[in-house]
Amino acid sequence: MARFEDPTRRPYKLPDLCTELNTSLQDIEITCVYCKTVLELTEVFEFAFKDLFVVYRDSIPHAACHKCIDFYSRIRELRHYSDSVYGDTLEKLTNTGLYNLLIRCLRCQKPLNPAEKLRHLNEKRRFHNIAGHYRGQCHSCCNRARQERLQRRRETQV
């Protein structure tokens, strides 16, 4: 992987990094900043889709794999949880409309789309302040959590 010595010239988004390296998302080989494994193709696309930032260690760009994103999101939640608020309260606290706020998923870090934010409002679900940023749950993580709860119930029933 190429080195980017000058911090002012470093691309911080994966598509920009691909442009700088004259490659494509399909062909880039980038390692996870946490576990040091090379990201699989699906993980590269997920990282780009989630609009996450590329980080640099010793001037070398790194991303994060799916497992590490899930794991460190949970760690961040446990260590830095502050409070939870409803959507209308969040709008009043920030003086910004809910649809203009960048709210990421609690688990996978994907930015919530307007439909997912509306789901939080309609179902009276709270947004959680974790390390100074509000988080919710995207549709797929919400369904995954529901499936995990159902599985645990089935396992505990006699």
UniProtKB/Swiss-Prot annotation:
Pfam families per the UniProt record, alphabetical: E6
InterPro entries per record: E6 (IPR001334), E6_sf (IPR038575)
Keyword Transcription regulation among record annotations: yes
Transmembrane parts of this sequence: none
GO biological process, one term: negative regulation of DNA-templated transcription
Reported impact of V158A: Complete loss of binding to MPDZ protein
Cellular compartment(s): Host cytoplasm; Host nucleus
Residue span of motif PDZ-binding domain: 156-158
This protein's GO CC annotations: host cell cytoplasm; host cell nucleus
Gene3D superfamilies: E6 early regulatory protein
Record keywords, A-Z: Activator, DNA-binding, Early protein, Host cytoplasm, Host nucleus, Host-virus interaction, Inhibition of host innate immune response by virus, Inhibition of host IRF3 by virus, Inhibition of host RLR pathway by virus, Metal-binding, Modulation of host cell apoptosis by virus, Oncogene, Transcription, Transcription regulation, Viral immunoevasion, Zinc, Zinc-finger
One annotated GO molecular function: zinc ion binding
Principal location listed in the UniProt entry: host cell
Zn finger region (unnamed): 32-68, 105-141
Miscellaneous: Belongs to the high risk human alphapapillomavirus family. The cancer-causing human papillomavirus E6 protein has a unique carboxy terminal PDZ domain containing substrate.
Function: Plays a major role in the induction and maintenance of cellular transformation. Acts mainly as an oncoprotein by stimulating the destruction of many host cell key regulatory proteins. E6 associates with host UBE3A/E6-AP ubiquitin-protein ligase, and inactivates tumor suppressors TP53 and TP73 by targeting them to the 26S proteasome for degradation. In turn, DNA damage and chromosomal instabilities increase and lead to cell proliferation and cancer development.
Quaternary state and interactors: Forms homodimers. Interacts with ubiquitin-protein ligase UBE3A/E6-AP and thus forms a complex with human TP53. Interacts with human NFX1 and MAGI3. Interacts with human IRF3; this interaction inhibits the establishment of antiviral state. Interacts with human TYK2; this interaction inhibits JAK-STAT activation by interferon alpha. Interacts with host DLG1; this interaction leads to the proteasomal degradation of DLG1.
Entry similarity comment: Belongs to the papillomaviridae E6 protein family.
Protein name, UniProt field: Protein E6
Organism from which the protein derives: Human papillomavirus type 18
Lineage summary: Viruses, Monodnaviria, Shotokuvirae, Cossaviricota, Papovaviricetes
